[in-house]
Amino acid sequence: MAQISVTPEELKSQAQVYIQSKEEIDQAIQKVNSMNSTIAEEWKGQAFQAYLEQYNQLHQTVVQFENLLESVNQQLNKYADTVAERDAQDAQSFGF
């Protein structure tokens, strides 16, 4: 049987790191998108189009990573709730 030595509060705190990281990535993407819009006004031609094409492909990978971070956040929160429920059930089994 596994021994759980982490508290639900610790798990929820750790889960927050994942969602905060996702939010930081969102902010970085917004900055880059804004920069791309500015550059697009001045940089014309095939080189810029190639850059945008590559950026859009890589952007999809970043979005997948963001989804992963959000998923891990949800899983950690769900597990924290499960640990808390199990602990409460165990406490009730002693009849105090």
From Swiss-Prot:
Presence of the UniProt keyword Coiled coil in the record: yes
Pfam families, per the entry: WXG100
Coiled coil stretches, renumbered: 9-86
Keywords on record: Coiled coil
KW Coiled coil (keyword) present: yes
InterPro entries, alphabetized: ESAT-6-like_sf, T7SS_ESAT-6-like
Annotated family: Belongs to the WXG100 family. sagEsxA-like subfamily.
Protein name: Uncharacterized protein CA_C3713
Organism this protein belongs to: Clostridium acetobutylicum (strain ATCC 824 / DSM 792 / JCM 1419 / IAM 19013 / LMG 5710 / NBRC 13948 / NRRL B-527 / VKM B-1787 / 2291 / W)
Lineage, uppermost ranks: Bacteria, Bacillati, Bacillota, Clostridia, Eubacteriales
